[in-house]
């Protein structure tokens, strides 16, 4: 009897206090975990994944810091010169000459190019060269066939505004940042609060060499956002000029959608770059690349519905639904509407899983 403690006395022991503190911590962790929405942003290279992530930051009012804008400023310069270098290399490969022979004098600038220091204006000798080269019909002939050579699709946006970009006081606008290309290597995480939940979005490198790293993000994923460029139906891969972007995306979606890792994971399909797709179908035949397409090549609605159906048919699980949306990652207002619907889908499915 003397060895027995009353309930009141036992509450004062260090062991009891540690146990109660541990219980509180577990409950708090469970509460935080239930509030966390973990999204995996996947897709083949050039699909616009990183642009979607940047648009989400704008939508949810996560500003770009001064340091980030400075990094993007220097990236814009690299986008300008590397895009032109791609075209010049293809001109040599395809034996295409300059219309204006004097443009040969600019080639030395693209053997190597300077690293832009912090706050250093872009070199003005490149402004003259880029203007001259962009107007050359030899350059334009390659640009018009850019789908065959993985020419960046942001070039026309930047090259129509070179004077602004080369201004000594230039600071990238949100539109400049959205269109700035920077190959995703490894895993980039972005976190933001929304509707009493914390969203953690992981952008994973899309090129083939990056895909082996995806495995580290698979556990406890709430949803997969899979991004595909509709405009890639006639385009080659950056890393493999003999492979088609859309075919690559279809194969990748098949493996992701039907993976054991995602058996109970919501699958959100972003059919992206609808703006570029609408322009392309006016002159680039879908049937040439996808002979089973039986619609009018220039029928925008029929064409995009065809590709939506191609992806949805890959789902082999009767218990899994695909939620497709047509997007333009550089149109923040459109993406805001799409993301509102996506959020409803994710939270509804999340609640269903908790109940089950």
Curated annotation (Swiss-Prot):
The keyword Methyltransferase does not apply. Residues 327-332 are annotated as: G5 motif. Residues 176-184 are annotated as: G2 motif. One of its GO terms (cellular component) is heterotrimeric G-protein complex. Residues 38-51 are annotated as: G1 motif. Residues 199-208 are annotated as: G3 motif. Mg(2+) binds at residues 50, 184. A lipid is attached at residue 4 (S-palmitoyl cysteine). Residues 268-275 are annotated as: G4 motif. A lipid is attached at residue 2 (N-myristoyl glycine). SMART domains: G_alpha. PROSITE patterns: G_ALPHA (PS51882). One of its GO terms (biological process) is negative regulation of pheromone response MAPK cascade. Its cofactor is Mg(2+). Residues 35-356 form the G-alpha domain. Keywords: GTP-binding, Hydrolase, Lipoprotein, Magnesium, Metal-binding, Myristate, Nucleotide-binding, Palmitate, Transducer. GTP binds at residues 46-51, 153, 178, 184, 206, 272-273, 275, 329. G proteins are composed of 3 units; alpha, beta and gamma. The alpha chain contains the guanine nucleotide binding site. Belongs to the G-alpha family. Guanine nucleotide-binding proteins (G proteins) are involved as modulators or transducers in various transmembrane signaling systems. This is Guanine nucleotide-binding protein alpha-2 subunit. It comes from Mycosarcoma maydis (Corn smut fungus).
